[in-house]
Amino acid sequence: MKKLGIIYGFILGVLAINAPEVLPQNTFPSELVNFKEYPGNPIFTGTNVDTWDKQIRERGFILKEGPNYHVWFTGYSPASPTKFLGYATSKDGIHWERFSKETIHPGQWVEDMCVVKSGKTYYMFAEGEGDIAHMLVSKDRVHWQEKGNLDIRKVDGSPIRKGAYGTPTVIQAKGIWHLFYERDDLGIWLATSKDLKTWTNVQDEPVIKMGPDAYDLFAVAMNQVIHYKGLYYGYYHASAFKDWHEWSTNIAVSSDLIHWKKYERNPIIGNNQSSGIVLKDGKGFRLYTMHRKVNLYFSEGASK
Protein backbone atom coordinates (compact mmCIF):
# COMPACT_ATOMS: atom_id res chain seq x y z
CA MET A 1 0.00 0.00 0.00
CA LYS A 2 2.81 2.36 0.87
CA LYS A 3 4.39 1.79 -2.56
CA LEU A 4 1.00 2.38 -4.23
CA GLY A 5 0.64 5.61 -2.29
CA ILE A 6 4.04 6.80 -3.46
CA ILE A 7 3.18 5.95 -7.08
CA TYR A 8 -0.19 7.69 -6.77
CA GLY A 9 1.46 10.78 -5.32
CA PHE A 10 4.04 10.80 -8.11
CA ILE A 11 1.30 10.62 -10.76
CA LEU A 12 -0.60 13.48 -9.14
CA GLY A 13 2.59 15.54 -9.06
CA VAL A 14 3.24 14.96 -12.76
CA LEU A 15 -0.35 15.88 -13.60
CA ALA A 16 -0.07 19.06 -11.54
CA ILE A 17 3.11 20.08 -13.34
CA ASN A 18 1.62 19.50 -16.78
CA ALA A 19 -1.83 20.95 -16.12
CA PRO A 20 -2.42 24.59 -17.03
CA GLU A 21 -3.20 27.05 -14.26
CA VAL A 22 -6.85 28.04 -13.86
CA LEU A 23 -7.16 31.48 -15.42
CA PRO A 24 -9.31 34.22 -13.84
CA GLN A 25 -12.65 34.99 -15.43
CA ASN A 26 -11.72 38.37 -16.92
CA THR A 27 -8.63 37.22 -18.79
CA PHE A 28 -9.09 39.49 -21.81
CA PRO A 29 -9.05 43.14 -20.68
CA SER A 30 -10.96 45.52 -22.93
CA GLU A 31 -7.82 47.43 -23.89
CA LEU A 32 -6.38 44.27 -25.49
CA VAL A 33 -9.41 43.26 -27.55
CA ASN A 34 -11.55 46.32 -28.32
CA PHE A 35 -10.05 48.63 -30.93
CA LYS A 36 -11.20 51.58 -33.04
CA GLU A 37 -9.68 52.25 -36.44
CA TYR A 38 -7.56 55.35 -36.98
CA PRO A 39 -9.39 57.45 -39.63
CA GLY A 40 -6.19 58.25 -41.54
CA ASN A 41 -5.39 54.63 -42.48
CA PRO A 42 -3.29 53.30 -44.07
CA ILE A 43 -0.35 54.95 -42.34
CA PHE A 44 2.44 53.16 -44.25
CA THR A 45 2.50 51.40 -47.62
CA GLY A 46 4.77 50.36 -50.44
CA THR A 47 5.86 53.14 -52.77
CA ASN A 48 3.58 51.91 -55.59
CA VAL A 49 6.27 52.92 -58.09
CA ASP A 50 9.18 50.97 -59.57
CA THR A 51 11.35 50.62 -56.46
CA TRP A 52 12.61 47.61 -54.49
CA ASP A 53 9.74 48.26 -52.03
CA LYS A 54 6.95 48.89 -54.49
CA GLN A 55 4.86 46.72 -52.20
CA ILE A 56 5.19 45.53 -48.60
CA ARG A 57 4.04 42.22 -47.16
CA GLU A 58 3.82 39.93 -44.15
CA ARG A 59 4.61 41.10 -40.63
CA GLY A 60 6.71 44.17 -40.10
CA PHE A 61 7.75 45.01 -36.55
CA ILE A 62 7.61 48.23 -34.54
CA LEU A 63 9.55 49.19 -31.42
CA LYS A 64 9.21 52.42 -29.47
CA GLU A 65 12.36 53.72 -27.78
CA GLY A 66 12.04 56.99 -25.92
CA PRO A 67 9.86 59.31 -28.02
CA ASN A 68 10.72 57.62 -31.32
CA TYR A 69 9.14 54.74 -33.21
CA HIS A 70 11.09 52.33 -35.39
CA VAL A 71 9.61 50.00 -38.00
CA TRP A 72 11.29 47.22 -39.96
CA PHE A 73 9.37 46.01 -42.98
CA THR A 74 9.59 43.65 -45.94
CA GLY A 75 9.64 45.26 -49.38
CA TYR A 76 9.39 43.59 -52.77
CA SER A 77 8.73 44.29 -56.42
CA PRO A 78 8.15 42.37 -59.66
CA ALA A 79 11.79 43.07 -60.57
CA SER A 80 13.12 40.52 -58.04
CA PRO A 81 11.76 37.40 -56.32
CA THR A 82 13.79 38.27 -53.20
CA LYS A 83 12.08 39.99 -50.28
CA PHE A 84 14.24 42.74 -48.75
CA LEU A 85 14.53 44.51 -45.39
CA GLY A 86 13.51 48.14 -44.99
CA TYR A 87 13.59 50.54 -42.06
CA ALA A 88 11.69 53.73 -41.22
CA THR A 89 11.29 56.03 -38.23
CA SER A 90 8.55 58.19 -36.78
CA LYS A 91 7.98 60.75 -34.04
CA ASP A 92 4.36 59.76 -33.49
CA GLY A 93 4.01 56.24 -34.84
CA ILE A 94 1.74 57.53 -37.58
CA HIS A 95 3.83 59.58 -39.99
CA TRP A 96 6.88 57.64 -41.19
CA GLU A 97 10.12 58.53 -42.94
CA ARG A 98 12.12 55.84 -44.70
CA PHE A 99 15.74 55.67 -43.57
CA SER A 100 16.96 55.14 -47.12
CA LYS A 101 15.65 54.77 -50.63
CA GLU A 102 17.48 51.43 -50.69
CA THR A 103 17.13 48.28 -48.63
CA ILE A 104 19.28 48.35 -45.49
CA HIS A 105 20.31 44.70 -45.96
CA PRO A 106 20.92 43.96 -49.64
CA GLY A 107 21.54 40.52 -51.04
CA GLN A 108 19.58 38.49 -48.51
CA TRP A 109 15.96 37.46 -48.10
CA VAL A 110 14.44 39.00 -44.93
CA GLU A 111 10.69 38.68 -44.45
CA ASP A 112 8.09 38.50 -41.68
CA MET A 113 10.32 39.73 -38.89
CA CYS A 114 10.18 40.01 -35.10
CA VAL A 115 12.67 42.30 -33.32
CA VAL A 116 13.67 41.94 -29.67
CA LYS A 117 16.07 44.26 -27.85
CA SER A 118 18.11 42.63 -25.07
CA GLY A 119 20.74 44.78 -23.39
CA LYS A 120 22.29 46.88 -26.14
CA THR A 121 21.71 44.34 -28.89
CA TYR A 122 18.80 44.02 -31.30
CA TYR A 123 17.86 40.49 -32.33
CA MET A 124 15.84 40.00 -35.49
CA PHE A 125 14.09 36.72 -36.18
CA ALA A 126 12.79 36.53 -39.73
CA GLU A 127 11.91 34.24 -42.58
CA GLY A 128 14.44 33.67 -45.32
CA GLU A 129 14.00 32.01 -48.66
CA GLY A 130 11.73 28.98 -48.46
CA ASP A 131 10.15 30.26 -45.23
CA ILE A 132 13.15 29.11 -43.18
CA ALA A 133 13.59 31.16 -40.00
CA HIS A 134 16.96 32.80 -39.39
CA MET A 135 18.46 35.33 -36.97
CA LEU A 136 20.28 38.63 -37.44
CA VAL A 137 21.80 40.96 -34.84
CA SER A 138 22.45 44.71 -34.75
CA LYS A 139 23.75 47.39 -32.42
CA ASP A 140 22.25 50.38 -34.25
CA ARG A 141 18.97 49.11 -35.81
CA VAL A 142 20.37 49.68 -39.34
CA HIS A 143 23.38 47.41 -39.88
CA TRP A 144 22.53 43.73 -39.42
CA GLN A 145 24.82 40.72 -39.15
CA GLU A 146 23.47 37.35 -40.29
CA LYS A 147 23.71 34.55 -37.70
CA GLY A 148 22.26 31.69 -39.73
CA ASN A 149 19.13 29.58 -39.78
CA LEU A 150 17.54 28.66 -36.47
CA ASP A 151 18.46 25.16 -35.29
CA ILE A 152 15.22 23.71 -33.92
CA ARG A 153 15.17 20.29 -32.27
CA LYS A 154 12.44 17.93 -31.16
CA VAL A 155 11.95 17.14 -27.49
CA ASP A 156 14.37 14.20 -27.85
CA GLY A 157 17.07 16.42 -29.36
CA SER A 158 16.76 15.24 -32.96
CA PRO A 159 16.23 17.82 -35.72
CA ILE A 160 12.67 18.69 -36.70
CA ARG A 161 11.63 17.35 -40.10
CA LYS A 162 12.86 19.24 -43.14
CA GLY A 163 10.62 21.91 -44.59
CA ALA A 164 9.42 25.41 -43.87
CA TYR A 165 9.36 26.80 -40.33
CA GLY A 166 8.40 30.44 -40.37
CA THR A 167 6.76 33.45 -38.71
CA PRO A 168 9.29 33.32 -35.86
CA THR A 169 8.03 35.15 -32.77
CA VAL A 170 10.29 35.47 -29.74
CA ILE A 171 9.86 36.58 -26.15
CA GLN A 172 12.24 36.33 -23.18
CA ALA A 173 10.70 34.95 -19.99
CA LYS A 174 12.52 34.09 -16.76
CA GLY A 175 15.90 34.12 -18.49
CA ILE A 176 14.79 31.76 -21.27
CA TRP A 177 14.20 32.62 -24.92
CA HIS A 178 10.86 31.34 -26.19
CA LEU A 179 10.32 30.88 -29.93
CA PHE A 180 6.89 30.44 -31.50
CA TYR A 181 6.92 29.24 -35.08
CA GLU A 182 4.53 27.79 -37.64
CA ARG A 183 4.87 25.05 -40.24
CA ASP A 184 2.87 25.90 -43.35
CA ASP A 185 0.53 27.87 -41.02
CA LEU A 186 -0.94 24.56 -39.83
CA GLY A 187 -0.22 25.12 -36.14
CA ILE A 188 1.92 27.13 -33.73
CA TRP A 189 4.85 25.36 -32.04
CA LEU A 190 6.98 26.49 -29.10
CA ALA A 191 10.72 25.93 -28.64
CA THR A 192 13.09 27.36 -26.03
CA SER A 193 16.77 28.24 -25.86
CA LYS A 194 19.28 29.54 -23.34
CA ASP A 195 21.99 30.44 -25.85
CA LEU A 196 20.12 31.46 -29.05
CA LYS A 197 21.97 28.67 -30.83
CA THR A 198 19.88 25.55 -30.30
CA TRP A 199 16.13 25.63 -29.83
CA THR A 200 14.29 22.65 -28.34
CA ASN A 201 10.57 22.01 -28.63
CA VAL A 202 8.65 22.15 -25.38
CA GLN A 203 6.43 19.53 -26.98
CA ASP A 204 6.35 18.13 -30.50
CA GLU A 205 2.69 19.02 -30.99
CA PRO A 206 1.48 22.58 -31.59
CA VAL A 207 0.71 24.65 -28.51
CA ILE A 208 -1.99 26.40 -30.55
CA LYS A 209 -3.90 24.32 -33.06
CA MET A 210 -6.26 25.32 -35.84
CA GLY A 211 -9.97 25.41 -35.01
CA PRO A 212 -12.32 24.17 -33.79
CA ASP A 213 -14.16 27.41 -34.63
CA ALA A 214 -14.43 28.56 -38.23
CA TYR A 215 -12.33 31.74 -37.98
CA ASP A 216 -9.02 29.85 -37.57
CA LEU A 217 -9.95 26.49 -39.04
CA PHE A 218 -7.44 26.54 -41.92
CA ALA A 219 -4.36 28.53 -40.77
CA VAL A 220 -2.73 30.03 -37.66
CA ALA A 221 0.58 31.84 -37.03
CA MET A 222 1.80 33.83 -34.01
CA ASN A 223 2.75 37.47 -34.55
CA GLN A 224 3.58 38.77 -31.08
CA VAL A 225 3.52 37.68 -27.44
CA ILE A 226 3.37 40.24 -24.62
CA HIS A 227 3.34 39.95 -20.83
CA TYR A 228 0.56 42.03 -19.29
CA LYS A 229 -0.97 42.01 -15.82
CA GLY A 230 0.67 38.71 -14.95
CA LEU A 231 -0.41 36.79 -18.06
CA TYR A 232 0.88 36.24 -21.58
CA TYR A 233 -1.14 37.38 -24.56
CA GLY A 234 -0.47 36.13 -28.05
CA TYR A 235 -1.67 38.01 -31.11
CA TYR A 236 -1.97 35.66 -34.04
CA HIS A 237 -3.33 35.72 -37.56
CA ALA A 238 -5.67 33.09 -38.91
CA SER A 239 -7.77 32.14 -41.88
CA ALA A 240 -11.26 30.71 -42.11
CA PHE A 241 -10.72 29.74 -45.73
CA LYS A 242 -8.99 26.75 -47.25
CA ASP A 243 -7.41 28.90 -49.98
CA TRP A 244 -6.31 31.57 -47.43
CA HIS A 245 -7.85 34.38 -49.47
CA GLU A 246 -8.70 36.29 -46.31
CA TRP A 247 -7.00 36.64 -42.93
CA SER A 248 -7.89 38.02 -39.50
CA THR A 249 -6.21 39.17 -36.29
CA ASN A 250 -6.89 37.19 -33.11
CA ILE A 251 -5.76 36.84 -29.51
CA ALA A 252 -5.15 34.04 -26.99
CA VAL A 253 -4.04 34.05 -23.34
CA SER A 254 -1.69 31.83 -21.33
CA SER A 255 -0.22 31.66 -17.85
CA ASP A 256 2.79 29.57 -18.90
CA LEU A 257 3.32 30.10 -22.68
CA ILE A 258 2.36 26.46 -23.29
CA HIS A 259 -1.35 26.18 -22.56
CA TRP A 260 -3.43 28.75 -24.44
CA LYS A 261 -7.05 29.88 -24.29
CA LYS A 262 -8.45 31.58 -27.38
CA TYR A 263 -10.64 34.66 -27.02
CA GLU A 264 -14.27 33.62 -27.37
CA ARG A 265 -15.03 36.67 -29.55
CA ASN A 266 -12.20 36.22 -32.04
CA PRO A 267 -11.38 37.66 -34.47
CA ILE A 268 -10.69 41.06 -32.92
CA ILE A 269 -9.91 42.57 -36.36
CA GLY A 270 -11.39 41.21 -39.57
CA ASN A 271 -11.60 42.61 -43.11
CA ASN A 272 -8.41 40.85 -44.18
CA GLN A 273 -6.28 42.83 -41.70
CA SER A 274 -3.54 40.59 -40.31
CA SER A 275 0.02 40.31 -38.98
CA GLY A 276 -0.99 42.36 -35.95
CA ILE A 277 1.29 43.68 -33.21
CA VAL A 278 0.60 45.98 -30.25
CA LEU A 279 2.43 48.76 -28.44
CA LYS A 280 1.56 50.18 -25.01
CA ASP A 281 0.08 53.64 -25.42
CA GLY A 282 -1.04 55.58 -22.37
CA LYS A 283 -3.73 53.58 -20.58
CA GLY A 284 -4.35 51.41 -23.60
CA PHE A 285 -2.60 49.99 -26.64
CA ARG A 286 -2.05 50.66 -30.27
CA LEU A 287 -2.65 47.77 -32.63
CA TYR A 288 -0.89 47.81 -35.98
CA THR A 289 -1.87 45.34 -38.71
CA MET A 290 1.11 45.05 -41.03
CA HIS A 291 0.34 42.87 -44.05
CA ARG A 292 0.35 44.65 -47.46
CA LYS A 293 -0.27 48.02 -45.80
CA VAL A 294 0.03 49.22 -42.22
CA ASN A 295 -3.24 50.13 -40.53
CA LEU A 296 -3.51 51.54 -37.02
CA TYR A 297 -6.13 50.94 -34.34
CA PHE A 298 -6.46 52.45 -30.85
CA SER A 299 -7.83 50.66 -27.83
CA GLU A 300 -9.99 52.40 -25.27
CA GLY A 301 -7.87 54.80 -23.23
CA ALA A 302 -5.05 55.03 -25.80
CA SER A 303 -3.79 58.49 -26.63
CA LYS A 304 -4.57 59.79 -30.09
Residue ranges and their predicted role:
Residues 6-7, 304:
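Short amphipathic alpha-helical "recognition" segments used for binding
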Residues 7-8, 36:
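Composition-driven detection of intrinsically disordered, low-complexity segments
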Residues 23-304:
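Carbohydrate-active catalytic/glycan-binding domains of CAZyme proteins
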Residues 1-4:
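Positively charged n-region of N-terminal signal peptides that target proteins for export
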Residues 8-16:
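Bacterial N-terminal signal peptides
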